[in-house]
């Protein structure tokens, strides 16, 4: 199995991407995006696991994230969309395998929106994101109960980034109709409740699948590996 760091030129920023090449490819490609204030390292365990099961994975850093290697500034959600869209285009140059977008938290929203905008994307995986997040973040901020880790990001803070995200869901999620999407909630998630994930799932078109895993918010990607693999195996049985 191989691991290569590449750089992809998006319209707004250059994007650092780790490419996980499987030893025995199964004709499935995944483009993966991390959550706010994190980096591609947060999804490394999940990506390496999927690589070991034959998937080619592109795991990238969103711009403006100081723990990552992309640099630049995160000016708004359009920068997230631009980054993942550029990585999808780069991944397609390597072959025509069915391609899925995958993400955790902020990356999950991005994965859903990018897939919705591109009907040639086979489907998506959304881990630990849900409907109604702006209201939940406002409550957490007012209570002083959470640090949104804005110091780890050059650019917009999380509440500002997500302030109109529900309108985005209303616009884009219906466009996923006919393509499979996996929605994963974590039972100990203090940032995105399972009820919020379930509401997003209930609003989404078919085909879709909902899974509840044992995890907190931060490590939901790692702990979702079994559910993600099972979902992929159902769609693409190994010979």
Which residues fall in each region the model found?
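N-terminal cap/lid segment of alpha/beta-hydrolase-fold proteins
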Residues: 1-24
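The serine-hydrolase catalytic nucleophile loop
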Residues: 36-48
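Catalytic nucleophile-loop/oxyanion-hole region of alpha/beta-hydrolase
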Residues: 37, 65-96
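Hydrolase active-site cap/lid region
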Residues: 113-160
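Short alpha-helix in the alpha/beta-hydrolase fold that links the catalytic acid
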Residues: 193-201
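Catalytic histidine-centered segment of alpha/beta-hydrolase-like enzymes
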Residues: 215-226
């Amino acid at each position: 199995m191989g691991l290569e760091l590449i750089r992809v030129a998006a319209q707004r920023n250059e994007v650092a991407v780790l490419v996980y090449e499987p030893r025995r490819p199964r004709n499935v490609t995944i483009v993966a995006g991390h959550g706010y204030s994190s980096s591609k390292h947060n999804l490394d365990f999940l990506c390496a696991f999927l690589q070991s099961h034959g998937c080619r994975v592109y795991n990238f850093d969103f711009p403006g994230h100081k723990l990552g290697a992309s640099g630049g500034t995160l000016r708004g959600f359009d920068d997230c969309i631009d980054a993942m869209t550029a990585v999808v285009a780069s991944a397609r140059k390597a072959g025509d395998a069915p391609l899925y977008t995958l993400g955790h938290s902020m990356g999950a929203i991005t994965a859903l929106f990018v897939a919705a905008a591109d009907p040639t994307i086979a489907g998506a995986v959304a881990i630990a994101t849900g409907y109604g997040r702006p209201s939940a973040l406002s409550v957490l901020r007012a209570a002083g109960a959470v640090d949104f880790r804005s110091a780890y990001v050059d650019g917009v803070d999380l509440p500002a980034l997500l302030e109109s995200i529900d309108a985005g869901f209303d616009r884009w999620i219906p466009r996923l109709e006919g393509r499979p999407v996996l929605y994963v909630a974590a039972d100990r998630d203090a940032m995105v409740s399972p009820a919020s994930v379930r509401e997003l799932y209930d609003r989404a078109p078919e085909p879709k699948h909902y899974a509840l895993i044992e995890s907190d918010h931060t490590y939901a990607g790692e702990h979702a590996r079994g559910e993600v693999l099972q979902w992929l195996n159902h769609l693409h049985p190994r010979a």
